[in-house]
Amino acid sequence: MKAIICGAGIAGLTLAWHLERSGWEVELIERAPAFRGSGYMIDFYGPGLQVAERMGLRERLRALRYPVDELSYVDRDGRQTSHLTMPPGMQEVISVLRGDLARTLQDDVRSPVRYATSIDSVEQDSGGVTVQLTDGTRRRADLLVGADGAHSRVRELAFGDGSRHLRYLGHQVAAYILEDRRLSERIGMRYQMLTVPGLMAGAYALRDDRLALLFLRREPEPRIPGDPAATLRRHYGELGWILPEVLTRCPDPPELYYDQVTQVEMERWSQGRVVLLGDACQAVSLFAGHGASMAMAAAWILADELAGCEDPVAAALRYQRRIQPTIGEVQRFGRRFIRWMAPAGRRHIIARDWMLRLAALPGVSRLFVNSLSPGGHNLIRSSSEVASPHPA
């Protein structure tokens, strides 16, 4: 059988890896002009890490990890107001750049990626699916997988108006990386953040004297500004800490990542021989902090259902039934976490800082950190294990 996968991000690459090894022919297309090595730090754990283990990638990801085990909040003068240190003995968390994870996956995928290409039209019949690509070619396959992100073109073609599936969470996010040895050494291997009502700015050091910046802004209007860099300077330039300095060197897109914070909610993830994967159908948002892990888990489950099957339409429905309830749980967690990560008022910031101080007490930190972890830790079981009343 053959699958066309639209989207060569974490979800699409993970699915390609598994389908190739179960005998499928895979064609990967990606609308970006080249591999995207950008993105912010992700804390990779739980089901995604279990999938990486099954793929033989865990040790390679460990070699790329950043030893970030402290979250520190500072004021406008850079003085620490509260902090949280990861207690020993917790489940393994690998802090890694999204681009490093994607590169690790792509290095092990056999199928080449056709870049600067998307889909113009989709036609289905009882025997397969035919797509018209933006380069003018037509391709046919047994299954089309839309793994092309929250603003999915495949979703729009198969399900109609794509925006109706988006749940805007009232915030916009930006991220970029700059080289600065002095600031990188000052921040060190920890997440350091400054929060004022409606605005959050964070920084963490990377290898090679680089510094990563992350910005989160409360914004009722979902429209992306025409000049994102100028928008960041206008809102954050007077907040103190390291912000005036780093914002003078803020690049323009694409070096500057800027987007809405959204979730994608859908009743159905497939339409015949077209199935959605990753953020195209299950975006959990930055607030949930579990997107890459859930994307890899979903790809593994879809591949598990497709392996050896003769009916990809039925396999797509089984895949949705296995993971959609967990995605809903993680999305609800993300919406609850907004008031913690992006406090709307001063009293919310004070309450959060006091909670962090309490969490530092002996015996409390483990309970507190566990409360910040969404579900999904029992997802990675084969279809035979799911069907068994006594899974191994």
Predicted regions and their residues:
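C-terminal helical "tail/cap" subdomain of flavin- and related membrane-associated enzymes
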Residues: 1, 288, 304-392
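Flavin-dependent oxidoreductases
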Residues: 171-204
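Conserved N-terminal helical subregion
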Residues: 3, 18-20, 45-159, 163-177, ...
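Hydrophobic residues embedded in beta-strands of well-ordered beta-sheets
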Residues: 129, 200-201, 210-211
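FAD/FMN-dependent oxidoreductases across multiple families
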Residues: 186-187, 196-199, 206-207, 215-288, ...
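Residues at the starts of beta-strands that form the adenosine-phosphate
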Residues: 2, 25, 210
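Conserved mid-domain beta->alpha element of the FAD-binding
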Residues: 6-32, 145-146, 174, 232, ...
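Short beta-strand micro-motifs enriched in acidic
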Residues: 124-125, 204-208
